[in-house]
Amino acid sequence: MNRRSILWSALSALGAALGGSSAKAATEAGAGNKLKVVYHLSDAEKVNFVLGNIENHIDGVGGPQRVTIALVIHGPALKAFHRAQANPDLGKRVGDFSRDGIELAACANTMKAQNVTLTGLLPGFVSAEKGGVVRLAELQSQGYLYLRP
């Protein structure tokens, strides 16, 4: 067996294993367990796109009571959520998310770099004290599926 065949076999096995875990997560969610999903947002130009994905996700599963969603924001994207410069539509969407129970986590490192506190952000945010990427890893270790649209 040559190296290429061994590599192909290993990749096929890995793909089957990963596909099985995704199928298991989907089956568990369909069996009455709420699916847990974390959305990752760092690109400023994707703010509206990601928020739209979350809205579509909630609508697609039949409402916020059927899914647990967290949104972790860091880097340039966080500027869009500064209270002083956020547009009213964005403020309404964030308020709706907060009322729906979506965790809105702002990276503490980014907040420090942008010289903003939680009171300077739109209402509903919590601070990811250890950093946004650490919060993403924590949520994934708790069974959240990771999405970065």
Predicted regions and their residues:
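A cross-taxonomic marker for long C-terminal extensions/tails that follow the last structured domain
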Residues: 84-149
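Surface-exposed patches in mature extracellular/periplasmic domains of secreted proteins
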Residues: 64-70, 106-109
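Extracytoplasmic
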Residues: 34, 64-66, 99
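Short, glycine-rich nucleotide/cofactor-binding loops
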Residues: 40-51, 81, 85
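Acidic helix-start/capping segments at beta-turn-to-alpha-helix junctions
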Residues: 68-80
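N-terminal export signals
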Residues: 5-25
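Histidine-anchored nucleotide/phosphate-binding helix
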Residues: 50-63
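C-terminal segment of N-terminal export signals and the immediately downstream linker at the start
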Residues: 20-42, 46
